[in-house]
Amino acid sequence: MNADMKWLDNPEVFRVNQLEAHSDHTYYESYEALEKKENALIQSLNGQWEFVFSKNVKSRPENFYEEDFDAKNFDKIMVPGHIELAGYDKIRYINTMYPWEGKEYRRGAYSMESTGDGAGMFSEAEYNPVGSYIKRFDLDPELCSKRVRICFEGVEEAMYLWLNGQFVGYAEDSFTPSEFDLTPFIREKGNVLAVQVHKMSTAAFLEDQDFFRFFGIFRNVTLRAVPEIHLEDVWFRPELYKDNASGKLSVNLKVSAPENRKINARFVLKDQEGSVVLEKSAALQEKNGIYTEEIQTDDAQVKAWDNHHPYLYHVYVELTDESGNLSEVVPYDIGFRRIDVIDKVIHLNGKRLVLTGVNRHEWSPKTGRCISMNEMKSDIECILRNNINAVRTCHYPDQIPWYYMCDAAGIYMMAENNLESHGTFQKLGAIEPSCNVPGSIPQWKEAVVDRARSNFETFKNHTAILFWSLGNESYAGDDIEAMNTYYKEKQDGRLIHYESSFYNRAYEDTISDVESRMYAKPYEIEEYLDHDPKKPYLLCEFMHDMGNSMGGLGTYMHLIDKYDMYHGGFIWDFIDQALYVKDEVTGKEVLRYGGDFDDRPSDYEFSGDGIVFANRVEKPAMQEVRYYYGLYR
């Protein structure tokens, strides 16, 4: 198969040769390696790459992926990172509009009769920047003679991949991992990896979030060697009984190995003191080299997980061959908690759930959405310090470590899909969905369901996730209903959230387990709850903290005492989106916001809505948050 630039125009092509999404577990070949946290099966490709920027597809270096290509005119660029922050293209901040508005007329493929299939919309555009990357590497010794895969944890927005002159695959969805099998093409030494990243494709219509519009390889890139017997996917399903003191655990395993092998799996659940709570073994059933099993445990005494007591158990899954030799061990931390809706009121472990939440973009004033572990840890500390008990991953999946941090800290999560098509149904504030995507357009359905699948499969084992969110501000139609159906069929006990069905009540019974609003006034909340409400109510966004804001928080919080079906909400938002630049006059480092980069169209200082500044200094409004949230956390 050869790479085809026309895929950029086609909403039905969003992954080519990608491996299936799977759980985000790590794996080791021995307990010794696990205890030392030294994983010789992983090789990072982060660091300096060769790079060239092109204005559009036709001016890109077409044959740059060939092994004998002369890249002497290429620059150097650091991965991970945004191409714009390396000095290429233009820095742009936009809220609802698409970056081409006022410059080019574009409507999503098949969204209007006049649009047709959108052929050439992005592949032949005069402006659609391309970043061509080359990484040369030798395999670490421990990866040799094994199956080798590559994982890109985040690439905006569409990417083509080659290794040693051979086409490997294509991916969209900027914020979930894209993984490919390199085994047929890789060698021990002298590998040439080539990645071509396109700023816009049909995925641009689905990624119209309120943020700076960057592109490039902005999250980690790793090679992963796969043992002969390998746990491809694991789904831990802890069940907490109504006494909040006992429960059981189901474990679904999917293992790859050569055919006709006798493979055994054993899992052990230990408490924080190291005592064994549950233990069970099973022989795996094989079909075409894939071995599966569902293991059910007996009942056991367990401790419940919640925001005040985020108790996690340590699980270890061992895979052994027919001789009893250990092939792989997988660690994971899980908690026991129970979500119920009783008389239209959400309960966690039998108690009414109150959300003192915040929406959180991933942001660094120096590196944009390419944030560090220290910045994530700082955010966790700030959240706990100020009585915030929940985060919404607006409006895309976050880096994988963030979910583990929230599990450990007891921070409730609304895990949102990478979806916002705001600009296709809202024009300068007016609701006008004539060209909405995905809507009910068949050609867009699989792309958005795939985003739901990637979100679920990657993060399904995280105790902190109480809600799956279908996306943000994308109107409502059959395609989003299909996403809702996908999550429902998983029956994982979590609730499904979506706000924009408010604009299309034809779907209110088939999309979302909650009535969700953004920026509803207090009297509007009361009006809904006073008139035979159908669902529990929450605010996915409220208290827009732009400028000197947050003064009305108490009015909203007092409604929690008045209405059991009102569950609080998520402040917009956690952190200002602003970038450090050197001031032209003083030479000092200052923060600049949307519109400060001569970016048009722009929504200007609308990028500054946080309860902390971009440098993570708390704003004066935080004292309101800390006080009122402290009354209900």
Task: Give the positions of each predicted feature.
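Accessory carbohydrate-binding/adhesion or oligomerization-edge regions at the termini
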Residues: 1-110, 192, 196, 557, ...
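Accessory beta-strand-rich segments of carbohydrate-active enzymes
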Residues: 3-16, 21, 36, 50-54, ...
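Substrate-binding clefts and catalytic carboxylate motifs of secreted carbohydrate-active enzymes
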Residues: 37-61, 78, 84-86, 128, ...
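Active-site-adjacent substrate/metal-binding segments within catalytic domains
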Residues: 81-139, 143-151, 157-162, 169, ...
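Surface beta-strand/loop "capping" patches
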Residues: 228-259, 624-633
